[in-house]
Regions:
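An intracellular "coupling" helix at the cytosolic face of ABC transporter transmembrane type-1 domains
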Residues: 37-40, 135-136, 154-161, 165, ...
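Short intracellular "coupling" helices and adjacent cytoplasmic loop segments at the cytosolic face
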Residues: 10-19, 116, 124-148, 152-154, ...
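Helix-loop-helix
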Residues: 74, 181-195, 265, 269-340, ...
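Hydrophobic alpha-helical transmembrane segments of ABC transporter permease domains
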Residues: 29, 48, 103, 107, ...
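Juxtamembrane helix-loop junctions of ABC transporter transmembrane domains
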Residues: 17-25, 49, 56-72, 87, ...
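ABC-type nucleotide-binding domain
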Residues: 79, 362-639
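Membrane-integrated ABC transporters
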Residues: 1-57, 72-93, 107-111, 115, ...
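Transmembrane helices of ABC transporter permease
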Residues: 38, 42-55, 96, 163-217, ...
Length: 639
C-alpha cells in the first residue's frame, strides 16, 4: 500500500506530484477488521441502534400525515373541538421520538467504547511492532514523523470510527427508508426530490475529488512539521551555540507554510460542500412544497395537506443525510491517509532472527557436566539444540572472531572489507582510525544491529546467526556513543541493565563505575529523578551512569563505543579506573577519541576506509611508525 509520490530536486520540502491513497477499499477493510476482531457484538448492537433511530425518525415524519389529516384538519371544522384525541396522538409521537433519542444515545455510548478500545489495541500493536523493527528503520526515518503516526494519524481514525462511519451507516439506512416512504406518499414528488439529489451528489463528487489529494498531503506535511520540531528540540543546545535561531525558524516557517497551504486547500474545498448541499436541499424543499400544494389544491390523486406536510418532513430528512454523507467522505479520506501511514509502518518487515542457540543459567552437576538451571548462578552457557534431538551446553566465555567479513549499509556500497580479527576472553581490543573508517560499524555487527553480507562472525565458536538476537545482546554490555537516560530515578536507570538486579547490585555497579560519589551528592541520591534524557547531569556523569548500567548486567563482552569521548580529564581518570576493573576477565572492544586511553589494550586495530591496515600492541605499532604512529605522535584523534 505504497503512496505514489515523486520528489524532484529543490529546497527542503520540494514536492513532486500530489500523493494519493492506493487501494482505499483494502485500507477500509483492514481498519474494520481491527474493529470487528474484538468488538463485533458491539458493532451489531450499534447497527441495531442505528436502524431503530432511523426508523423512528421516518415513522415520526409519516405520523405527521395522520396528525394533520385525522386530527388537526378535522378540528379546524369543529366549533368546539376536543383536544383529547390530539393530545393522545402527540403523546404517541413523543414516544416515537423518545425511542429514536434513546437509540441514538446508546449508539454514541457504545461507539465511544469501541473506538477507544480499537485505538488502544492499534497503538499497542503499533508499539509492539515498532519494538521488533531493525535499527536500520530508525536510522532512516525521522523520529518526529514516527511520532506523528502515533498521534495525528491515529487521531484521524478516532474521528472516522466514532463519527464518520456511524454517521455514514445511519445516513444510508435513513436514505433507503425515507426513499421508500416518499414513494408511498407521492411518486411524483419523489422524482422531483431525486433530481435535486442527483445534482447534490454530482457537486459533492467534484468537491471531494478536488479536496482528497490535499487531505492526504496535509497528513504528510503534518508529519514533516512534527519531525522538524522534535529534531530542533533535541538539538536546541547546538542551535543556540551556533546562533542559528533565525535559520531554524526559517526552516520551520517553510514547512509550516506548506502545511498551511495543504490544509487550506483541503478545508477550502470541504467547507463549501455543506453550504452548497444545504442550498440545494432548500431549493428541493421549496419545489416540493409548491408542487405538493398545487397538487393538493388541484385534487391530483390522493394528495392531501397531511401528505404534503409529511413529504416535506421526509424531504428534509432525505437531503440532510445526503449532505452528511458528502461531509463525512472528507473525514474518511483523511482517515485513510492516516491509516495508510499507520499500516505502512506496521507492514515494515520485523528484524529477522533465525537463531536457535539460547543463553541459559547453568551449573556443574556431580559429573562435572554443564546443565541448565532455573536459578541465577552467575554461570552462563550456550544451549545448542541439534538436529538429532540432542542438546549441548557450552560455557559462555566471550571469544569473538571475525573471518573475512564484508559489510555495507546498502548492498552496492561496501564499507568494511575483508575484516579478520579476534578477541580472546579477557582481552582488550581497541579500534582507532579516521572518521568513517568503520570502527562503530564493527561494533554494530557484533550485536547484530546490522548483518554482514559475507564472511562469518563467531561467538565462542558459534556463528552469531545461529544465536537468538535477544540472547546475543543479553551477553553484551554496551556503552553507546550517545548516552541515553530514561525518565525515572538514578537507581531505575542503572537497573535498566538488568531489571531483576537488587538495589545492592546497582550500587555495587555504580561504585565499580566510580559513579557512586557524584550520585550521593545529588539531591535525592539514588532516588533523584532524571528527566529530559538526564539534562540535569553533566555529560561525564551521564556516561558514568551508562557504564554503571552496563556493569550491572555483568556481561562477558563489553562494547565501549567512544564512552569517554566527552569526559573531562579528571572524570576520565575516574572512568578509566572503573573501566579497568569492569574489563578485567572480559573481552572488551573499545573505541576512544584519546589514544592515551587505549595504550594498555592487548591489541590495537587500525582501520582506514573499512580495511584493517595495522594491528598490534601500542609498543609494536609505535615501532612500525605507520598510521598509528602518525596519529599518536601527531596528537591526532580518530574522529
Amino acid at each position: 500500500m505504497a503512496v505514489k509520490e515523486v520528489h524532484g530536486p529543490g529546497p527542503r520540502g520540494a514536492r513532486g506530484p500530489r500523493p494519493k491513497v492506493e487501494n482505499p477499499g483494502k485500507l477500509l477493510k483492514r481498519i474494520m477488521d481491527e474493529v470487528f476482531r474484538n468488538y463485533l457484538p458491539h458493532c451489531i448492537l450499534v447497527l441495531v441502534c442505528i436502524v431503530v433511530s432511523a426508523l423512528a425518525n421516518v415513522q415520526a415524519s409519516l405520523f405527521l400525515q395522520t396528525l394533520m389529516d385525522d386530527y388537526i384538519v378535522p378540528m379546524t371544522r369543529q366549533q368546539n373541538p376536543s383536544f383529547t384525541p390530539l393530545a393522545g396522538a402527540l403523546v404517541r409521537m413523543c414516544c416515537i421520538y423518545l425511542v429514536g433519542i434513546l437509540a441514538a444515545w446508546a449508539n454514541a455510548r457504545i461507539m465511544v467504547n469501541v473506538t477507544q478500545g480499537t485505538l488502544r489495541n492499534l497503538r499497542t500493536k503499533l508499539f509492539t511492532h515498532m519494538e521488533s523493527l531493525p535499527i536500520r528503520y530508525f536510522d532512516t526515518h525521522p523520529h518526529g514523523d514516527i511520532m506523528s503516526v502515533y498521534t495525528n494519524d491515529v487521531d484521524t481514525l478516532r474521528q472516522m470510527l466514532s463519527q464518520s462511519i456511524p454517521q455514514l451507516v445511519s445516513s444510508v439506512i435513513t436514505i433507503v427508508s425515507v426513499f421508500f416512504s416518499m414513494c408511498m406518499l407521492s411518486w411524483q414528488l419523489t422524482i422531483v426530490t431525486m433530481l435535486m439529489v442527483a445534482l447534490m451528489l454530482f457537486c459533492s463528487k467534484q468537491i471531494a475529488k478536488s479536496s482528497s489529494k490535499y487531505f492526504i498531503q496535509q497528513q504528510r506535511d503534518l508529519g514533516k512539521v512534527n519531525g522538524y520540531i522534535e529534531e530542533m528540540m533535541e538539538g536546541q543546545k547546538v542551535v543556540k551555540v551556533f546562533t542559528h535561531e533565525q535559520q531554524t525558524l526559517a526552516g520551520f516557517r517553510e514547512l509550516n507554510d506548506q502545511l498551511k497551504e495543504s490544509a487550506k486547500q483541503a478545508n477550502s474545498f470541504s467547507n463549501i460542500m455543506m453550504p452548497v448541499n444545504a442550498q440545494l436541499g432548500n431549493i428541493s424543499y421549496a419545489i416540493c412544497a409548491l408542487t405538493g400544494a398545487a397538487m393538493a389544491v388541484g385534487g391530483v390523486g390522493s394528495m392531501t395537506l397531511g401528505t404534503v406536510v409529511a413529504f416535506l418532513s421526509l424531504n428534509k430528512g432525505f437531503n440532510m443525510p445526503i449532505s452528511q454523507v458528502s461531509m463525512q467522505a472528507n473525514s474518511v479520506i483523511m482517515a485513510l491517509a492516516g491509516a495508510e501511514r499507520i499500516f505502512k509502518m506496521m507492514d515494515e518487515p520485523s528484524e529477522i532472527d533465525e537463531g536457535y542457540v539460547t543463553l541459559v543459567n547453568a551449573k556443574y552437576d556431580r559429573n562435572d557436566q554443564l546443565v541448565e538451571t532455573a536459578e541465577r548462578t552467575g554461570l552462563w552457557a550456550w544451549k545448542h539444540p541439534h538436529h538429532d534431538g540432542t542438546t549441548t551446553y557450552h560455557k559462555l566465555a566471550g571469544d569473538i572472531t571475525f573471518t573475512d567479513v564484508d559489510f555495507g549499509y546498502v548492498p552496492e556500497k561496501t564499507v568494511l572489507h575483508d575484516i579478520n580479527l579476534y578477541g580472546r576472553p579477557g582481552q582488550k581490543i581497541a579500534f582507532v582510525g579516521s572518521t568513517g573508517a568503520g570502527k562503530t560499524t564493527i561494533t554494530n555487527l557484533i550485536n547484530r544491529f546490522y548483518d554482514i553480507q559475507d564472511g562469518k562472525i563467531r561467538y565462542d565458536g558459534i556463528n552469531i546467526h545461529k544465536i537468538k538476537k535477544a540472547d546475543l545482546r543479553r551477553s553484551l554490555g554496551i556503552v553507546l556513543q550517545d548516552t541515553h537516560l530514561f525518565t525515572g530515578t538514578v537507581m531505575e536507570n542503572i537497573r535498566y541493565g538488568r531489571l531483576e538486579a537488587t538495589d545492592e547490585e546497582c550500587i555495587a555497579a555504580a561504585r565499580l563505575a566510580n559513579a557512586d560519589g557524584f550520585i550521593k551528592r545529588l539531591p535525592e541520591g539514588y532516588n533523584t529523578m532524571l528527566t529530559g534524557d538526564g539534562a540535569n547531569l553533566s555529560q561525564g556523569q551521564r556516561q558514568l551512569l551508562a557504564i554503571a548500567r552496563a556493569a550491572v548486567a555483568d556481561p562477558p563482552v563489553l562494547i565501549l563505543d567512544e564512552a569517554t569521548s566527552s569526559i573531562d580529564t579528571r572524570t576520565e581518570a575516574l572512568v578509566q579506573r572503573g573501566m579497568d576493573g569492569l574489563m578485567y576477565g572480559r573481552t572488551s572492544f573499545v573505541i576512544a577519541h584519546r589514544l592515551s586511553t587505549v595504550r594498555n589494550a592487548d591489541c590495537i586495530v587500525v582501520l582506514e576506509q573499512g580495511r584493517i591496515i595495522e594491528r598490534g600492541s601500542h609498543d609494536e605499532l609505535i615501532a612500525k611508525k605507520g598510521k598509528y604512529y602518525q596519529l599518536y605522535t601527531g596528537n591526532l584523534t580518530e574522529n
